Amino acid sequence: NYQAPIRLIKQVAERNCKIRLVQLSSLVALCPHPYLAAYSASKAALQTYCLALQEELRLKGSEMRVCLYILGPVRTAIFPPELQNALGGSQLQMSQEIAARRIIGLLQQGRSYAIVGKRYRLLAWLMKLLPQRWIIRLIGAYLRKGL
């Protein structure tokens, strides 16, 4: 989740091509999730790298753009069924098709950073209101039900 994308981004950046590189991140980058510690850390590192690189490229006058889009849970096979159920099952997860359509829309609008989906933007906003420790405890209790 971190090393391979960074290596690829560096190789493309060295060529200074006129290209938009799309990198997907996750809400876990904004608030670490218990039971997903390594995933949370890798997404946070990748997100931080991309945000810093966006500014570096802008200051250099590079034609390359790094677009960073943050997603909440998307219906994929990445998580075991028990954890998917703990994440609210399919009703709380965005479909892959909707996620793809929204990302394409953001690219067409020229947006280089966004939290994809109203529900997930609301969650990110709410996470700013409470102390992070409280949020981590709530998420841990919620996820533990599915393990």
Residue map of PLM features:
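Active-site helix of classical SDR
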Residues: 9, 42
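Active-site-adjacent segment of SDR/Rossmann-fold oxidoreductases
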Residues: 15-16, 31, 52-64
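Hydrophobic structural elements of the Rossmann-like NAD(P)H-binding subdomain
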Residues: 22, 66-69, 79
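Residue(s) in the substrate-gating loop at a strand-loop-helix junction
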Residues: 26
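Active-site loop-to-helix junction immediately N-terminal to the catalytic Tyr of the SDR YXXXK motif
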Residues: 32-40
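C-terminal helical subdomain
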Residues: 68, 86-124
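Short, flexible catalytic-loop segment of classical short-chain dehydrogenase/reductase
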Residues: 71-81, 85-86
